[in-house]
């Protein structure tokens, strides 16, 4: 499987056994000005996340592109 991986958000071939791509988003102290933090990568199973963290998992090549946010002005 190929997934987008941060920090560069480039498409990379996942290690053997890691067939899930994920997009994890959450707010930090700069959320109001910069938007959510985003973490992209490969995993063997969809990662468990803490409350307040959104996770989306998928299993096709490059199915986790860097999200495009509508910027607040």
From Swiss-Prot:
Main subcellular localisation: secreted
Keyword Disulfide bond: yes
Alphabetized GO MF terms: acetylcholine receptor inhibitor activity; ion channel regulator activity; toxin activity
Expressed in which tissues: Expressed by the venom gland.
Superkingdom: Eukaryota
Entry keyword Magnesium: no
Compartment list: Secreted
InterPro entries from the UniProt entry: Snake_3FTx, Snake_toxin-like_sf, Snake_toxin_con_site, Toxin_cobra-type
Membrane spanning stretches: none
Cysteines paired by S-S bonds: 3-21, 14-42, 27-31, 46-57, 58-63
One Gene Ontology cellular component annotation held by this UniProt entry: extracellular region
Similarity comment: Belongs to the three-finger toxin family. Long-chain subfamily. Type II alpha-neurotoxin sub-subfamily.
Official protein name in the record: Long neurotoxin 2
Organism: Ophiophagus hannah (King cobra)
Organism ancestry: Eukaryota, Metazoa, Chordata, Craniata, Vertebrata
